[in-house]
Swiss-Prot record:
One of its GO terms (biological process) is mRNA processing. InterPro entries: CELF3/4/5/6_RRM1, Nucleotide-bd_a/b_plait_sf, RBD_domain_sf, RRM_dom. The lineage of its organism: Eukaryota, Metazoa, Chordata, Craniata, Vertebrata. Its main location: nucleus. It comes from Xenopus tropicalis. This is CUGBP Elav-like family member 5. Residues 1-39 are annotated as: Disordered. Keywords: Cytoplasm, mRNA processing, Nucleus, Repeat, RNA-binding. The keyword Repeat applies. The gene is celf5. GO terms for cellular component: cytoplasm; nucleus.
Length: 486
């Protein structure tokens, strides 16, 4: 189910700007008579607010009394579908004064629930405005003797400073870095341009670092990357910027991650190939700590004999003949003679021969596979070879493989939930539950793995994992005979 985000709402508003907005006067957007329009001026640093969780039967004139108690309103626009004209349950609000916006956010954000709504109203700066992350600077390579007052004096020439804090260890000693928050984005940008790399502080190993502080999402992604690295898991969806990502690419990446995992943790299939549009080169990939699972041939292909990692100098080889879009990898595949002499006996031909027509539709047009295996390498396998289950078709995993996740961020959807738990194993399904009336996330969901060990690894790593101001609650979903899943 589609959800409206602040960024999408802002994009639609830019495509269809309000008809009655005037550049500097302070009118009310909407069907208000001219007598009620104000002649006040908008502050240069006025904040544009995003307002969510609004009943769909309320228009601008109905919302005005709620917001004008905090100050004069410059613009109030309810977002509507560009094609159907239907109310989307959110709006943009701009006050004439910056202080009015701050007061409204403090008094209303998640503090008041409007009639007919299940969740409290959301009032926060829109993405296009000066959010806290756009005004907050990270300052590194400071002298460990510098105090908050000295850091403040260094930056106060560029504007009004709202906060300044030096990061300190448990013993109270400075870590040589600080956070400085200005009152506007322009002031913070000016400080970056003037001070970044401008000097080397006493005792610092390199020049001064001044940059915008990371947002909550960036910090969360970085922590997840670090956690994945500690577990020894390689997950391209976390290691590379993948947005926007198609559903097919996610499913393919998930399947290829499963191919890399085996029941013994020491074998891999050389037939793995990653989409060149997302990964240009892959060096060595550490397989230590990969979740244990039976090897799954990619996209329905029967796997040739598995190969010990000691005999494989390169992880993968290019399918240049069958996949013209793939970029060759730096390592070459070992000769088949070498493979077959490593105490590995070829599969006997007891099953029907593999034909091109039986391949996955994604591999339509593949004419030959001699880039990796000659004809002998495609010898059919025995009937005892386990066949992989269909990817992303089963709604729930076996007993002990289904997780309940609570305290999810409001903006998280099915894709974000999948990417968060993909490092721990093969995901059968993932779902964030939505409110049918408001089309907003209920902030909880479910993830189903194909084996219990992956589920337990995910619980140990992600239960209590902090995202923003919330800590995830991750536990096994109760059996179906219980009335509640948690």
């Amino acid at each position: 189910m589609a959800r409206l985000t602040e960024r999408e709402a802002r994009r639609q508003q830019q495509q269809h700007p309000p008809q009655q907005q005037q550049p500097r006067a302070c009118p009310m957007s909407g069907p208000e008579p001219p007598a009620q329009q104000s002649d006040s001026m908008k502050d240069l640093d006025a904040i544009k607010l995003f307002v969510g969780q609004i009943p769909r039967n309320l228009e601008e004139k109905d919302l005005k009394p709620l917001f004008e108690q905090f100050g004069k309103i410059y613009e109030l626009t309810v977002l509507k579908d560009r094609y159907t004209g239907m109310h989307k349950g959110c709006a943009f609000l701009t006050y004439c004064a910056r202080d009015s916006a701050i007061k409204a956010q403090t008094a209303l954000h998640e503090q008041k629930t409007l009639p007919g709504m299940a969740r409290p109203i959301q009032v926060k700066p829109a993405d296009s405005e000066s959010r806290g992350g756009d005004r907050k600077l990270f300052v590194g390579m400071l002298s460990k003797q510098q105090s908050e007052e000295e850091v403040t004096s260094m930056f106060q020439a560029f504007g009004s400073i709202e906060e300044c804090s030096v990061l300190r260890g448990p013993d109270g000693s400075s870590k040589g870095c600080a956070f400085v928050k200005f009152s506007s984005h322009a002031e913070a940008q000016a400080a970056i341009q003037a001070l970044h790399g401008s000097q080397t502080m006493p005792g610092a190993s390199s020049s001064l670092v001044v940059k915008f502080a990371d947002t909550d999402k960036e910090r969360t992604l970085r922590r997840m990357q670090q956690m994945v690295g500690q577990l020894g898991i390689f997950t391209p969806s976390l290691a590379l910027p993948i947005s926007p990502y198609s559903a097919y690419a996610q499913a393919l990446m998930q399947q290829q991650t499963t191919v890399l995992s085996t029941s013994h943790g020491s074998y891999l299939s050389p037939s793995v190939a990653f989409p060149s549009c997302h990964i240009q080169q892959i060096g060595a990939v550490n397989l230590n700590g990969l979740p244990a699972a039976p090897i799954t041939p990619a996209s329905g292909l029967h796997s040739p004999p598995v190969i010990g990692t000691a005999a494989v100098p390169g992880l993968v080889a290019p399918l240049t003949n069958g996949f013209p879009g793939l970029v060759p990898f730096p390592s070459s595949h070992p000769a088949l003679d070498t493979i077959y002499t490593n105490s590995i006996v070829p599969y006997p031909a007891q099953s029907p021969a593999l034909t091109v027509e039986s391949l996955h539709p994604s591999f339509t047009g593949v004419q030959q596979y001699s880039a990796i295996y000659p004809t002998a390498a495609l010898t059919p396998v025995t009937h005892s070879t386990p066949q992989p289950p269909p990817i992303l078709q089963q709604r729930e995993g076996p007993e002990g493989c289904n997780l309940f996740i609570y305290h999810l961020p409001q903006e998280f959807g099915d894709n974000e939930l999948t990417q968060m738990f993909l490092p721990f194993g093969n995901i059968i399904s993932s779902k964030v539950f939505m409110d049918r009336a408001t089309n907003q996330s209920k902030c909880f969901g479910f993830v189903s793995f194909d084996n219990p060990s992956s589920a337990q690894t995910a619980i140990q790593a992600m239960n209590g994992f902090q995202i923003g101001m919330k800590r995830l609650k991750v536990q096994l979903k109760r059996p179906k005979d219980t009335t509640q899943p948690y």
